[in-house]
From Swiss-Prot:
This is FANCD2 opposite strand protein. It comes from the Eukaryota. It comes from Mus musculus.
Length: 178
């Protein structure tokens, strides 16, 4: 079930990297009432479990076989019907850019341009739309611009901290409300 919860069913690291490591997340013991006999599953939990029993998770072949070009995992040819009455859900596969890859229908370099005093961008680089050769780069920032940039960064950090503090207070209030 996809959605936000006040406590996660597994650790945040597992939640972030479970698809990459091809492992099943282990239940977390963060919540004191989880899996307790005093608190049985709600009817909605049972309904979700019944819905998920009708779906089959198929772990497929590797993303790219030797001699093939990489395709997006959600391509129409990847969706196949199954002869029995169960549906098929394909696990999304990570796409790794290494060296040269095909993105948006044309060959690009996967590495960003390196800073060597000026940006040097080839025509086939993914950054050619962001950085043009005709663009004139400033030679340096003036002191007032530096001060204004530092002030803006401090204000943004303060805003982020205030938002985070508000989020933590709301989460605490929701967890301890009746």
């Amino acid at each position: 079930m996809a959605g936000y919860q006040l406590w996660s069913p597994w650790t945040p690291l597992d939640e972030s990297f479970q698809w990459l490591r091809h492992t099943t997340p282990t239940p977390s013991s963060k919540h004191p009432f989880r899996a307790s006999p005093c608190f049985p599953h709600t009817p909605s939990d049972l309904e979700v479990q019944l819905c998920l029993q009708e779906v089959t998770l198929v772990l497929d072949r590797p993303l790219v076989e030797p001699g093939e070009s990489p395709k997006l995992p959600c391509h129409k040819s990847e969706l196949r019907a199954v002869s029995n009455k169960k549906g098929v859900v394909r696990k999304p596969q990570p796409v790794r850019l290494s060296g040269v890859d095909s993105v948006f229908g044309r060959v690009i370099t996967a590495q960003p341009p390196k800073w060597t005093g000026t940006f040097r961008v080839s025509d086939k680089s993914a950054f050619c739309k962001i950085i043009s050769r005709e663009h004139q780069w400033p030679t340096g920032l003036k002191e007032p611009q530096v001060q204004m940039t530092v002030t803006m960064c401090k204000q943004m950090l303060r805003s982020i901290l205030l938002l985070y503090a508000t989020y933590k207070k709301c989460t605490f209030a929701l967890q301890h409300s009746k």
